[in-house]
Structures are given as C-alpha cells and as structure tokens.
Amino acid sequence: MKLIRSCIVSFSMYSKIPMPQFKWNDDDMKYMLVFFPWIGAVIGLLLMLWRYIYSHFGVTDICYVCIGALIPIAVTGGFHIDGFMDTMDAFHSYKPREEKLAILKDSHIGAFAVIMFAAYGLLFMGAFSQIMDDKAFIVFGAGFFIARCLSGIAVVSFKSAKSDGLLFMFADTAHRTIVRAALYIQLALCMAVLLIVSLPYAVAMIIAAALSFWYYYVKTKKELGGITGDTAGYFVCICECAMAVALGGVSFII
C-alpha cells in the first residue's frame, strides 16, 4: 500500500495525469522518486502512439513535429521547463552564487529564460524531426524514462545547494539507499533492453545521457554549490534534448 501511495504522489507531483487525492506524509515520499521514471514511460508511450497516428492517418510533417514536442509538456504541465527557464536566468546573470540562488526563487521571467527556451524548443523540434527510423524512435521514447532515472539519482546523490525547498524536502525524506538502488536497477534494465533493440542508437543515447549527467554535476557545483528543484527540471530538459540530438544525428548518418 505504501508503494502505491508513493507512486500516486510521484505522478501527482511531476505530472498532470489525474490521480486520487489524499494528504501526503513523510512515508509516502520515501520512495516517491522510485516511480518518477514511469512518468517518462507514459510520455514515451504517448509519443509512439502519436507516431503511429502520423504514419497511418496522413498527418502532415509540421503537425507531427509540433504535437510531438508538445506531448512531454502536456503530460508534465511544463513542470521541468519552469525549472529550466529559472536556471537559465540564474546562470546567465553572471552574479555571485547567493544572488543566483535568489534568482531561482524569483517568480518573474527574465529575457535569457525566454531566449534559451526558444532555442531549446527549436533544437528539440529539429532533432525530433530527424528521428524517422522505427528503432531510433523506440530508443528516443525510452529516453524520457532514462532522463528521469538520472534526475532521481542526482537528487539522492548530489549535494543540495540549499537547506530548504521541495528538492531538499524530498531528498531528506527519501530512503536514499533503496531509492538509489531502485533507480540504478531500472536504468540498467532499460539500457540493456535498448542495446538489444538497436546497438548504435542505444550507444549514442547512453553517451548523450552520460555527458548530460556529468555536465549537470559540474555546472551546478560550480555555479550554485549544488542542485535545487529548479536545476533538477533543467537537467531533465537538457538530457532529453541531448538524447534527441544524438539520435537525430545518428539517424542522419546511417
């Protein structure tokens, strides 16, 4: 029952998928991050359904790309994009660490957030349009699962930049050892299946995900002294985009 409640809390927190409502407690949040990747699985399945509709019902290319880019936003309600934009404002302020952390708390949107989100959207849509091979698209769909596995691992492994906020609360209440092990197991199983589906596409995506994870650790440590809830959303976005670019590039080559 506790695991079911943790799953519901995870989907309630990180998606717009309707879930039963109840009062959360610390026990419910202990294993919440274990189920975080499955929101990515839902996104991947919806994208595959959309690809099937595109292939069989005469959907135009531009409609296919636009709706395909919109599906992750619709499922999550833009939760991670909000973190991406706040983080872009903070990183591009070039101010001292304390002021960057203050910018992350600011509810106002800055010019750099808009500019970088526009650039991100164009890059993601361009890469998405290049992923035409069926096996490449299966790997791409699984990337949303992988990005969330890595994001959850970062939450329970990396240093927090501050001692308050949602990320600190979730990391503090999580059973770190069990959550970390569960996420690593899910990540390893997913990658193993993808390597069977298509070795070149899987290797390209795994490299992109690993580089994104490394960059995230180095960048947040340098700029903020650790991670926050906003940077967790930022990581999900950059990891998804990096994997899409890698798959789009390999699709173009082979």
How would you describe each model-predicted region?
Residues 1-77, 91, 95-96, 106, ...:
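Hydrophobic alpha-helical transmembrane segments
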Residues 82, 93, 101-102:
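Glycine/small-residue-rich loop that forms an oxyanion/phosphate-binding "nest" at active or ligand-binding sites
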